[in-house]
Structure formats: C-alpha cells, structure tokens
Amino acid sequence: MGANETKNTTILAMDVVKAIHAKLPDTHLVMHGSSSVPQDLQDIINEFGGEMPQTYGVPVEEIETGIKNGVRKVNIDTDNRMAITGAIRKVLTEKRAEFDPRAYLKPALEAMEEVCVDRFQRFNCAGQAPKIKAIPLSDMAARYASGSLDPTVH
C-alpha cells in the first residue's frame, strides 16, 4: 500500500491468513504494503512544511497477528521513509542555514533506526540474527532441484 492509498485504518482478512497457514504450515507468507503509517510521523512531516494528507496503514497489532499465523516477511518501508523525511524536514526548518548533509542525515538515520528497533521488538525478531546460518547458493539450488522446498499441503 503506500502512504497515500487508504483513507481509513486497514483491517486485514486474518481469517484467510490463518486458513492458509493451517493448510500450508511450512510456507512462509509475506505482508506487502504493511507499513503502519504512524500518526506521529505524519504530524512531524506536516509540522515542518510537509503536506502529507491524512492517511492510514496497517495497525501494528494486525501485523503481529499475521506473524503469529505464518507471516515471515513484513515490509515497513513507508514507515522508514516517513521517519527519514520528518527528521530531515525538522532539521532543515529549524536550521535554515544548514547545508551539510551530515547535519540532517544523522537524525534521519536515527529516526529510521527508532522505527526499526520498535518493529524488531514488536515482531519478536530482535536478537534472532545469530540463529540464521548462511547457506551457499549451490546448496539452495540443490534443495530447490530436489523438491525438498516444495510446500506441503495439510
């Protein structure tokens, strides 16, 4: 979805997600367009010269429900872009003579990091990276060729 595509809170068909997960429990689902479009980030953008119309995304609670039911990849790019944009607008408004990108990119990255840390914690993926083992491309190709990665329908 993007930041300008819905005019009210998006409620997902979690019954469908749950049904898919029940039939294909080993299949990892992806939530495209799952940014929450936080109101506080919209407010920062608009307070510092933006003209972002009132819009809504997917409530984080809905995403959390999806994760409990087989969703393994969630796209939150819009939230990150909003955090970056708001931080840059704030610096450039408050320090109008500023021209050094380091002065506005550092707070922009910090704002994005804040969004990411929040989502990593809420989505229960914080601290999980050490559990991921790198798999060589040749091994993955062999898995695909053997059919061992084909979905199992229950």
Q: For the regions a protein language model found, what residue spans apply to each?
A:
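Alpha-helix-loop-beta-strand connector modules within alpha/beta enzyme cores
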Residues: 9-31, 35, 39-47
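Glycine-rich tight-turn/loop motif centered on a GG-T
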Residues: 1-16, 47-52, 90-109
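C-terminal alpha-helical cap/extension of soluble enzyme domains
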Residues: 58-154
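Short, electropositive alpha-helical surface patch
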Residues: 13-19, 42-56, 89, 131-137
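Hydrophobic faces of well-ordered beta-strands that scaffold small-molecule active sites
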Residues: 29-32, 52-54, 72-76
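Residue-level recognition of short, structured coil/turn motifs
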Residues: 25-26, 49, 124-128
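Flexible loop/turn segments at secondary-structure boundaries
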Residues: 1, 37-41, 82-84
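Catalytic cores of alpha/beta
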Residues: 37-48, 57-68
